A protein has these predicted regions:
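Zymogen propeptides/activation segments of proteases
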Residues: 25-412, 419-694
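Gram-positive cell-envelope targeting signals
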Residues: 1-39
Length: 694
C-alpha cells in the first residue's frame, strides 16, 4: 500500500485551491528559490559556489549503474542513480540536493518552485513532487520529482521544468475592491449581498490549470431546496477577468477547499440499492451499490458518502455554469441500468487505486462527479466516455447513453487512470508522444484492473470487449488499425500542430506502442500483480513531458524499486523491438514490414503547420472507395508511411477555416477533386515517391 504523507496533503490542497491567502496566513510549504547573491549572506553557500556534478561523477556515486535521458537542449530529464551524498529527510533536503546538479537539469539562479506533496511507497521509497513557478504563475507541464531510497539517499529524479527561466519581475495583484467591482458588473442584481470582509487571494483549478485569482463572496439568491448552499464564490483572475462561480455552504479565511464540494455529502444518510442490470448481450447481473437519502427534499441520490462520489447530468454541469442536477429517485428504485453499471464500475476502479492508498484520483479524496447523458452544447448525444479534469472542485467523468462503455471495467478504469496520471504528473500534455503515452497508461492499467478483478475472460488484452464494442488489441494492435512498432502500418508521426483532425498527433493510434510492450511483459512471465506495481510506480516517476526514452528509464527505475530487475533485459528488448529508443523520426522513415511497401512525398512548411491529412482507400467490390487509414505531414513536412502491397487511391485534405478542401492523386499528380483518381501501386519492399504538395 502506498502511503501519501498527510502533511504534504495540505500542500496539495493549497496548490489546487488556495495558494495565497490574505496577509497573516502562511503556507505549510513556501516557495523555494535556489540561492542567489541577493538573497543570502556572504558566509552562506551560494548557488554559484556549488560544485556542479558531471554524469561521470554520478556514475561513480552510483556504482556505474546510473541512467540518464535528455531533451534536445542537452538537459537531463530522467536521472536514475545517486546524485547527492547527504541524507534527504524533508522536502527542504530534496531542494538542497538539487544545487549540485542545477546545471544538468537547467536550474538557473532564481528558479522558483514549490513542493506539491510527498509520499512513501510500500518499498520505502519517498517521492517529493515540485512544480515550477514564474512571475507568480504555475508553469504548465513543469514538474520535478525527487526520489529517495529507504536509507534516505537520493535515488533519482525526473524533470520537465522549463530550463533557465531566470528571475521574474514582481507581479501586481488586483485589489479586493477592484475584484468586487468586476463581480458587481457581472451580477448587478440587487438581491446579491456582498461579504467584502472575506474577499481574498486564492487559486482554482480551471480548464485543467491552476489559476491564481481573487475570490469574492456573495449571497446565493437561487439556493437549492436540496442542499444548504447560501453563498456563492466568484473567482476573478489577477488580470481582472471574471472566471467562474460556484455555490458554497460557508465563507471564511480558513479555506482548504475553495469549492466546498464536500458540503454536498453532509446531511445525507447512507443507503444501498440491490437490483438486476441487463447487459448489452441480454445477460443479467445482480449488483449492490451505495445510495444516499436527503431528508431536505425526500429524494434518494446515486451517491457514495464514503468514497465521495455522486452522479449528475452532464449538460447542466457543463453548459449551465456548473449547475448540479443530481440523479435521484423518490424511493430508491427505478434507477437507469446504464447509470447503475457505470457507477458500479467506477466504484471498482476507485477501490483498486484505494488499495494502493490513492483515494480518488489524487490520494487526497477529491470528490468525484460522474456526469451522465454526455452531449454537445445543442443537446446532441456524444458517443464517448471521458475524464475531463477537475472542475468546480470535482474530479469529472463523462458517460454516454448511446453506448455501453460503462459495462466494461477496462474502459471505466481507463478513464479513471487518466485522472490518476494527471494528478501524479501534475498535468498532461495531451499531444504527440506524451499524449500517446498517457493513453497507453490508461489502456494498460485499465486492462490490468479488469483482469485482476475477474471481470473478463479475455487473454488477448482487448479493450472494451465486455461492452460488445472492442476498440483495441494490445496483443495484436494491427487488428484494430494500430501500430506494433514505430513506423509500422497505421503509425502516426509527431505533428507540428496537434488537433482534432490529426487526433492530437495520433494519441489514440500510437498508444498501442507502449501497451503492446505491457502485453509482451505479460507473455514473458510477468504476473498481473507485478505489472501493476511496475506501471503504477512508473506513473509516479514520469512528468507531463516524459517521452518514450523517459518512460523506458522510469520503467527500469520502477523495476529496481519493486524488486523486478530480472525483467530489465526484457524491458530493454521490447523497447528496442518497438523502435522506441533513440531517434524515432529516422526509425519511422527506415521501418519495414514483410509484405509492405512505402509511400512518400513532402508538403510545404506552411501546410505542415496546419491540420492537413491524407486518407488512403482501396476499391470495394462495387467500385467505391473503402477507407483504410489516414496519415499526416510530420514535423519535417514529410508524409512517409507503410502500406501492405496493393493498389490504393489517395486523397489529401487541406483544412481551412471554411472547411476541408480535397485534392486527389490523379494520373497527372495531385489535383482538386476526387473523381478519376489514379491507382498508386505499392510493392513489397519498395518506396513509391509521389509529387510534393505546396
Amino acid at each position: 500500500m502506498r502511503k501519501r504523507q498527510k502533511r504534504y496533503g495540505a500542500a496539495l490542497a493549497l496548490v489546487l485551491s488556495v495558494l495565497l491567502l490574505l496577509s497573516g496566513c502562511s503556507r505549510d510549504f513556501p516557495e523555494h528559490f535556489l540561492q542567489t547573491e541577493g538573497s543570502v549572506q556572504p558566509t552562506e553557500k551560494q548557488y554559484n559556489d556549488t560544485v556542479q556534478l558531471t554524469e561521470n561523477d554520478i556514475q561513480q556515486m552510483s556504482g556505474g549503474k546510473a541512467l540518464f535521458t535528455y531533451i534536445d537542449q542537452g538537459y537531463v530529464t530522467t536521472l536514475v542513480g545517486k546524485y547527492y551524498e547527504g541524507k534527504i529527510e524533508t522536502y527542504e533536503d530534496a531542494v538542497s540536493s538539487l544545487n549540485g546538479i542545477a546545471s544538468l537539469i537547467g536550474l538557473s539562479a532564481g528558479s522558483e518552485f514549490f513542493c506539491v506533496y510527498g509520499e512513501t511507497d510500500p518499498m520505502g521509497y519517498t517521492y517529493y513532487t515540485f512544480q515550477q513557478k514564474y512571475g507568480g504563475l504555475t508553469l504548465q507541464y513543469a514538474t520535478l520529482k525527487v526520489v529517495v531510497d529507504p536509507e534516505g539517499h537520493a535515488a533519482g529524479l525526473s524533470c520537465s521544468f522549463t530550463p533557465n527561466v531566470g528571475i521574474a519581475e514582481e507581479k501586481t495583484f488586483i485589489s479586493a475592491a477592484e475584484a468586487e467591482r468586476i463581480v458587481r458588473q457581472s451580477f448587478p442584481e440587487p438581491e446579491y449581498r456582498y461579504y467584502t470582509d472575506f474577499t481574498q487571494k486564492s487559486a482554482v483549478t480551471y480548464n485543467n490549470r491552476t489559476v491564481e485569482c481573487m475570490v469574492v463572496y456573495t449571497s446565493n439568491p437561487e439556493q437549492s431546496v436540496s442542499f444548504d448552499m447560501p453563498f456563492i464564490e466568484h473567482f476573478v483572475t489577477y488580470a481582472g477577468e471574471y472566471l467562474t462561480s460556484v455555490p458554497t455552504s460557508s465563507i471564511g479565511s480558513e479555506i482548504s477547499d475553495a469549492y466546498k464540494t464536500d458540503d454536498y455529502f453532509k446531511g445525507l444518510t447512507p443507503a444501498t440499492y440491490t437490483g438486476a442490470v441487463t447487459l448489452f448481450d441480454g445477460s443479467i447481473r445482480q449488483i449492490t451499490v451505495p445510495t444516499a437519502y436527503n431528508a431536505q427534499d425526500g429524494q434518494y441520490y446515486l451517491a457514495d458518502l464514503e468514497r465521495k462520489i455522486m452522479v449528475a447530468d452532464y449538460a447542466a454541469f457543463n453548459f449551465q455554469n456548473g449547475r448540479l442536477d443530481f440523479v435521484t429517485t423518490p424511493d430508491n428504485q427505478g434507477w437507469d441500468g446504464n447509470y447503475l453499471i457505470t457507477y458500479y464500475n467506477y466504484l471498482l476502479a476507485y477501490d483498486y487505486y484505494a488499495d494502493m492508498n490513492i483515494r480518488s484520483i489524487d490520494g487526497f479524496e477529491t470528490p468525484i462527479l460522474i456526469t451522465v447523458n454526455m452531449c454537445d452544447a445543442e443537446g446532441n448525444p456524444e458517443n464517448n466516455a471521458c475524464f475531463y479534469g477537475i472542475n468546480n472542485g470535482w474530479a469529472c467523468f463523462g458517460s454516454s447513453q448511446v453506448n455501453r462503455y460503462g459495462e466494461a471495467l477496462d474502459v471505466v478504469a481507463h478513464e479513471f487512470t487518466h485522472g490518476v496520471t494527471r494528478s501524479a504528473m501534475q498535468g498532461t500534455k495531451y499531444a504527440n508522444e506524451t499524449g500517446a503515452i498517457n493513453e497507453a497508461y490508461s489502456d494498460i492499467m485499465g486492462n490490468i484492473i479488469e483482469m485482476r478483478a475477474g471481470a473478463t475472460t479475455d487473454g488477448a488484452w482487448l479493450l472494451g470487449e465486455m461492452c460488445g464494442e472492442t476498440m483495441r488489441s494490445m496483443s495484436n494492435p494491427n487488428t484494430y488499425a494500430q501500430p506494433a512498432f514505430v513506423g509500422d502500418v497505421f503509425y502516426g508521426a509527431n505533428v507540428l500542430n496537434p488537433g482534432r483532425y490529426n487526433d492530437n498527433g495520433s494519441v489514440h493510434t500510437n498508444n498501442s506502442l507502449l501497451s503492446h510492450i505491457a502485453y509482451g511483459l505479460y507473455k514473458s512471465g510477468m504476473s498481473l500483480a507485478e505489472e501493476s506495481r511496475l506501471w503504477f510506480t512508473s506513473i509516479e516517476l514520469i512528468t507531463p513531458l516524459s517521452d518514450y526514452d523517459d518512460v523506458y528509464a522510469c520503467l527500469l527505475f520502477s523495476a529496481r524499486i519493486n524488486g523486478l530487475e530480472q525483467y530489465a533485459d526484457t524491458i530493454t528488448r521490447l523497447f528496442t523491438e518497438a523502435g522506441l529508443l533513440g531517434n524515432r523520426e529516422q526509425t519511422a522513415y527506415a521501418a519495414a514490414r514483410a509484405g509492405c511497401g512505402r509511400v512518400e512525398f513532402s508538403v510545404s512548411d506552411a501546410l505542415a503547420q496546419g491540420y492537413d491529412f491524407v486518407s488512403v482507400y482501396t476499391t470495394g467490390q462495387d467500385g467505391s472507395g473503402v477507407y483504410q487509414l489516414s496519415v499526416c505531414p510530420d514535423v519535417n513536412a514529410r508524409v512517409s508511411f507503410l502500406l501492405p502491397a496493393g493498389q490504393y487511391m489517395l486523397v489529401y485534405a487541406h483544412v481551412t477555416q471554411e472547411g476541408l478542401a480535397y485534392y486527389g492523386y490523379h494520373p497527372t499528380g495531385w489535383a482538386s477533386g476526387t473523381d478519376g483518381l489514379a491507382y498508386v501501386q505499392v510493392t513489397d519492399g519498395q518506396t513509391v515517391y509521389l509529387n510534393d504538395i505546396s
